[in-house]
From Swiss-Prot:
Gene3D superfamilies assigned: Laminin (2.10.25.10)
Classification via InterPro entries: cEGF, EGF-like_Ca-bd_dom, EGF-like_CS, EGF-like_dom, EGF-type_Asp/Asn_hydroxyl_site, EGF_Ca-bd_CS, Fibulin_C, Growth_fac_rcpt_cys_sf
Gene disruption: observed consequences: Homozygous mice for the EFEMP2 gene appear to be outwardly normal. Homozygous mice exhibit severe lung and vascular defects including emphysema, artery tortuosity, irregularity, aneurysm, rupture, and resulting hemorrhages. Mice died perinatally. Mice with conditional knockout of EFEMP2, in vascular smooth muscle, grow normally, are fertile and exhibit an arterial stiffness. Mice with conditional knockout of EFEMP2, in endothelial cell (EC) are healthy with an normal aorta.
Domain of life: Eukaryota
PROSITE patterns listed in its UniProt record: ASX_HYDROXYL, EGF_2, EGF_3, EGF_CA
An example Gene Ontology biological process: elastic fiber assembly
Sugar attachment sites: 198, 394
Modified residues (Pyrrolidone carboxylic acid): 28
Gene it is expressed from: Efemp2
Name this polypeptide is given: EGF-containing fibulin-like extracellular matrix protein 2
Family to which the UniProt record says this protein belongs: Belongs to the fibulin family.
Pfam families, sorted: cEGF, EGF_CA, Fibulin_C, hEGF
Amino acid sequence: MLPFASCLPGSLLLWAFLLLLLGAASPQDPEEPDSYTECTDGYEWDADSQHCRDVNECLTIPEACKGEMKCINHYGGYLCLPRSAAVISDLHGEGPPPPAAHAQQPNPCPQGYEPDEQESCVDVDECTQALHDCRPSQDCHNLPGSYQCTCPDGYRKIGPECVDIDECRYRYCQHRCVNLPGSFRCQCEPGFQLGPNNRSCVDVNECDMGAPCEQRCFNSYGTFLCRCNQGYELHRDGFSCSDIDECGYSSYLCQYRCVNEPGRFSCHCPQGYQLLATRLCQDIDECETGAHQCSEAQTCVNFHGGYRCVDTNRCVEPYVQVSDNRCLCPASNPLCREQPSSIVHRYMSITSERSVPADVFQIQATSVYPGAYNAFQIRSGNTQGDFYIRQINNVSAMLVLARPVTGPREYVLDLEMVTMNSLMSYRASSVLRLTVFVGAYTF
């Protein structure tokens, strides 16, 4: 009730009430319609025409299109197109009719909410209903009564856009880094693999993973090495092994014969010799070891590489045996007058190609008589002059090898010692019959 109504007469009070009702029913300002109306997105209510009219977003939205894009208005919305794009307008100039306005009750819910069938206010998911203004490069996250535009993992916001972060600039990877849209990938150098954190690199044990080494494999940091067993050498490919021909490298590995075998070599000696740990060949003394076939009536004589069975009694008429190696010609026998009084049998062995001159045997007088003079000579068996006698003193002399000789060969030298005494007009001789065996080898 108006505050001054009580001062008016009754008829005037009635007219004032009617005028008040008429004023309330008259058209209001177009911006404030007498009924609540709602237009769809992209349209607004035109109070004059009582219709929804298109909103020109290109004029109403500041910087509707960014960068080099141009804004093209169309019914119910707008487009952002490149400036070089051609736009063909409707030839008849008729656009789609504006959607009809429909009356509805005002939204009783706060912004970002809408009523459901039970008239409860529920959150509007702007992200799923495309009611957001997030850029294509951004992610829309719905919030209670609102939404939020964020950059995906691996991106950062520069201006209005989300730009990929080059994680490789921050050296996250131990070896190599490959940048990817929104992410990155670490790679390792050959010989390494990614660790559990996918960033650091750990050494790969190629030997446990089937490295192509033929014989032996040694793992090292970031790689592996192939090695060969003793007696083999690594091939140029770095993986396979080939046998070393040790015998072809040197002729001094073995004294006699070198035989190459896979991964090794062996030394061999000729028959009659045994191999020593030093790879030298040593003569086997068959007479000492009993590995001979001499009878009881024979004597075993060993020489380099073999042995000889000789008769125990080697005395020939008119000589008689007085000991195992000595034959005596009796003075009572007339046949002994022109013969040496005794013959002593000796045996020795020398190697082939011995350096010369070489002292090989010393002759020694067993009896010394006062006033006697002894002379030594080679009586027989030195037809080629391979030996000569060098007298040392009155009672001894040395048999000398004058030239290198090659075996197998055998010499029987009669070394004579002539004893003379001018005062007594005495002359006698004795012979040392020396059998010299020359071995077939230089050892």
